[in-house]
Amino acid sequence: MKSHTQSLLAESLNALKQQGIVPADFEARIQVDRTKDKSHGDFATNLAMMLTKAAGKNPRELAQLLIDNLPESSHVEKVEIAGPGFINFFIDDNALANQLMAALNSDTLGIELPASQTVVVDYSSPNLAKEMHVGHLRSTIIGDSVVRALEFMGHKVIRQNHVGDWGTQFGMLLAYMEELRAANGEQAKMELSDLETFYRAAKVRFDESEEFATRARKLVVALQSGDEYCNKLWREFNDISLSHCHELYERLGVSLTRADVRGESAYNSDLAQVVADLDSQGLLSESNGAKVVFQDEFKNKEGEPLPVIIQKADGGYLYATSDLAAMRYRSNVLNADRALYFVDLRQALHFQQVFKLAKTAKFVREEMSFEHMGFGTMNGEDGRPFKTRSGGVVKLIDLLKEADIRALDLVRSKNPDMDEAELAEIARVVGIASVKYADLSKNRASDYIFSFEQMLSFEGNTAPYLLYAYTRVAGIFKRAQDVDLSDAKIILEHEKEKDLGTKLAQFGEVMARMVSKGQPHALCGYLFELAGAFSSFYEACPVLAAETEELKKSRLLLSQLTAKTLKQGLNLLGLETLERM
């Protein structure tokens, strides 16, 4: 309905241009918004006020002219002018009911899909040779929910797990493994828990022993030069790390696979060419022996230009170099229309600089969009970054295990007589959903407080509340299995029926926002409001005990569409649903 309203206004504006009321070359973005007050209709626009200066008329006069030139539409019941010149549209109840019927019979809930694009999504991207910790959670689940939404909206999505699989840390690990195998033979274990120990012990050795540090640096050079022994060990480290990552992805219900991994090492052979191409364009400068690029747009507090370091004085490359190579690949090989980077907000300046440099150096197509989808920090209840009691980093697996335990206690308290196997399965779904939803329901650009108590509550905008809301709606159909809905149609007469129908019709608008802005919290908020609208409808409008058979069937259809929308929305967030809680 929103896009239909915009189309009506576009035709009216063209008519005013043809009549000479508005200059023919005037370009206006037609903004149509949902009204917050039902007395103001369903949609409102400030188009008349935008035209005032160009047309030389007062906005209320222009509003009337726009209304007079609107094409006829069976979707619109009436149009009114409000305030200084707002135009309010009231949608016809029958048109809304028809839209809802179409949504019921559609795999995409009746959403008008946009033109398909190829979208690269860079997310999760942990450093290998370490266990994933809670700091990886936000990128992983926010990115994955947006990926699901993009695919649902008909886009071709290329997942890119840009893992940190290269660099000095591998020299330290290789050197320490040599020491370990010298002491214990080839039987030295390579389990993931050992990798954590290896890393810490190797770092201590690197910091304390110059001989060890020298050996580690030589091993990095050997690794970069293709040494067979070093590469074999490096692949072992990476394989163990990736196995751990994908166990966590599976537990979290994240769609990343091994095929989506394209780490820093994938661009090693391209880095020298990046430097050479920047140099040939006269973009490189030297600063303290390093090769850097200065861009006028980026300065420090003193007004001095901030460099993008491309190559260190010792010849080593940095994140900017591999990011530029990756951008080139994503633009010119993958031929993407958009590239979305789900990376901590603290990297905002870095991405602003490399995005600008890639365009300046013509490494990427001018029309391609690069977007940093930054996110804030997950904090403990003390407001500080989430840590263990001893101040250490919280492993992601430990967080998920605790969520399982707490969810099991919660579910058991609600269902003391339930079979243990069923309890465990429900607790698994509730635990993972609660952790994910608590994050996804917050504006990604904001920091948030992690609280098991809040996220496992059945009250408020939480996963348990929404999962229960879904089971409540789905339960209606278990009691109405003998009702034939083949000839049923939706009727919107009661105020709460209209409210629920209006909320259901907003799903497409919310999805459009989620994919354009990368904001899962918009979908979370919508699902919470939808569950509330259904609750109000259910209390005011008897379903199985409706006054007439026709009304019962209509309300069953509204319930069916609510269940379908809740389930689809939760699945797009990466959450499983339950038929019983």
Curated annotation (Swiss-Prot):
Gene Ontology BP, a term = arginyl-tRNA aminoacylation
Q: What class of enzyme is it?
A: ligase
Q: Which residues cross the membrane?
A: none
Record-linked InterPro entries: aa-tRNA-synth_I_CS, Arg-tRNA-ligase, Arg-tRNA-synth_N, Arg-tRNA-synth_N_sf, ArgRS_core, DALR_anticod-bd, Rossmann-like_a/b/a_fold, tRNAsynth_Ia_anticodon-bd
Q: Which UniProt keywords apply?
A: Aminoacyl-tRNA synthetase, ATP-binding, Cytoplasm, Ligase, Nucleotide-binding, Protein biosynthesis
Residues spanned by motif 'HIGH' region: 126-136
In terms of Pfam families, this protein maps to: Arg_tRNA_synt_N (PF03485), DALR_1 (PF05746), tRNA-synt_1d (PF00750)
E.C. numbers:
6.1.1.19
Please give the GO cellular component terms listed in this UniProt entry: cytoplasm
Q: Catalytic activity, per the record?
A: tRNA(Arg) + L-arginine + ATP = L-arginyl-tRNA(Arg) + AMP + diphosphate
* Keyword Ligase appears in the UniProt entry: yes
Q: Taking the first listed entry, what is the main subcellular location of this protein, grouped into a coarse class?
A: cytoplasm
Which protein family is named in the record? Belongs to the class-I aminoacyl-tRNA synthetase family.
Read off the PANTHER family from this record: ARGININE--TRNA LIGASE, CYTOPLASMIC (PTHR11956:SF5), ARGINYL-TRNA SYNTHETASE (PTHR11956)
| Subunit structure of this chain's protein | Monomer.
Q: What is this protein called?
A: Arginine--tRNA ligase
Q: Which organism is it from?
A: Shewanella pealeana (strain ATCC 700345 / ANG-SQ1)
Q: Tell me the organism's taxonomic lineage.
A: Bacteria, Pseudomonadati, Pseudomonadota, Gammaproteobacteria, Alteromonadales
